[in-house]
Amino acid sequence: EVLSRTIKDGRVISLIHKYLNAGVIANGIFERTEIGMPQGGPLSPLLSNIMLNELDKELERRGHRFVRYADDCMIFCKSKKSTERTLKNIIPFIEGKLFLKVNRKKTTVAHVSKVKYLGYSFYRNKGKCRFRVHTKSVAKMKNKIRELTDRNNGMSNAKREEKYQQFVRGWVNYFKLADMKNLLKDTDEWARRRIRAVYWKQWKKIKTKYRMLKALGMDHWKAKELACSRKGCWRMAQVLNQIFSNKIIAKLGYIPMLDYYLVVCEN
């Protein structure tokens, strides 16, 4: 019914129905889709906007401030009481008029500082609402860096550098609205130490370590001392901080997150 009010071509509506009822293959097994649609499907965001356009109009008619991305929506009110009242009134509209089911587990009343939305969290500064990266998003980012800089993943240096650069560019561009200079500064220092540890393990033999340290500009006796050290990779990564400098790591292709963030913000 909602689709028919927006889309006048019956053939298109028929095609959409066929798509929704086509089923999915999960782990090699066909499963029927009787409710909803496959997550991540190319039609999902388009249908979300068609279906929820009615919700947008209703919220505007009621004078609410809100933000919506696909089916993820936040409605802003001045007090907890008015928020609870709005929630109580809007759910019947969504379920009764749009025939959509509201996920009660994900629907909540909370202060904006306690909310996670599209990976962001929010805080107030000088009377304005500011963005920061949510702690869960930070944890996911660090887990990805751990994966890319794992000393035992068997990845070639060229492939690791390429994947690391791709991840940094994508992640920073997504979260560029957030205030995160300090976060990225600390993350860069931690990531560079992990990268140094990767190279130290790759050098393996004492003579290889000595040769590489000399190539980095270390004098004979110091290079010999470090090459013979029995300290672990993580400890040695800290010792190598000055000789295996940040500039060298950047030249290898490991783009600093903070530097890229500042460039993105300027543009």
PLM features per residue range, with description:
Residues T33-P38, D150-R151, Y174:
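Short hinge/gating elements
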Residues K8, L43, L47, S82, ...:
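Catalytic cores of large soluble enzymes that bind and process phosphate-bearing ligands
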Residues D9-I13, L87, V138, K142, ...:
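Alpha-helix initiation and N-capping motif
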Residues E1-K114:
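Conserved polymerase palm-domain catalytic core
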Residues G63-Y69, M141-D150, K201-W203:
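Short, conserved aromatic-histidine micro-motifs
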Residues Y199, W203-N267:
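Extended C-terminal regions of large enzymes
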Residues R160-I206, Y210-K214:
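Non-catalytic, peripheral interaction segments enriched in hydrophobic/basic residues
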Residues N21, P92, K97-E162, Q166-R169:
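A conserved non-catalytic segment of reverse transcriptases
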